Amino acid sequence: MIVSIAGKLVQVGEISVIIQAAPFDYEVYVGDYTRRQLQNQIGNEVRLHTLDYIEGNAQGGRLTPRLIGFSTLPERQFFDLFCSVDGVGVKKALRAMVRPVKELAVLIEEQDAKTLSALPGIGPATSEKVIAKLRRKMPRFALMVAGGEVADAMEVESPIVSDTYDALVTLGHSESDARKLIDETLATGKKFKDTESLLTAIYQRSK
């Protein structure tokens, strides 16, 4: 599987971009939010995290490999989860990626079915399915900082963020308050080896 691609951005289209990675030019499909981020990067060197999939019908005899690109690893991970919801799939998920992943994650976490259903390709029924399946998996994405990644001190794959979030909610904090406390602490850039050290830092900041 191709997990990333780096090269010169030579074209930005409506649903895909062209990256020149010598000696080949690759077409990479992107969501609208990523496309907007790349519009001013034509001619520059870029790197996209990628997923590949096969489009077409095996019975029809035409199968076409496709690449989907994301600016950050958490965006790719979110997309992978999004596609796992029954009735979503790759094409529908890609159409829906019109807002930052952090915003989408917050909508899911807060069960905002009305706003979710307004996303391209996502109606009321699908939005309810998305919330039911993904709500508990969203804290780590809802805590993404403005730069795209969870603060460099904390990789998104780490369970520390999710475990700390769960602990704060168990201790009586609201979901939004727990998210804010973690977000502010991670933004300091400090490193945390476990949930206990992150919780300690959070409460030290709150004093």
Swiss-Prot record:
NCBIfam families: ruvA. Residues 1-71 are annotated as: Domain I. It comes from the Bacteria. Has three domains with a flexible linker between the domains II and III and assumes an 'L' shape. Domain III is highly mobile and contacts RuvB. Residues 150-155 are annotated as: Flexible linker. Residues 72-149 are annotated as: Domain II. Signal peptide: none annotated. It is found in: Cytoplasm. Keywords: Cytoplasm, DNA damage, DNA recombination, DNA repair, DNA-binding. This is Holliday junction branch migration complex subunit RuvA. One of its GO terms (biological process) is SOS response. Pfam families: HHH_5, RuvA_N. Residues 156-207 are annotated as: Domain III.
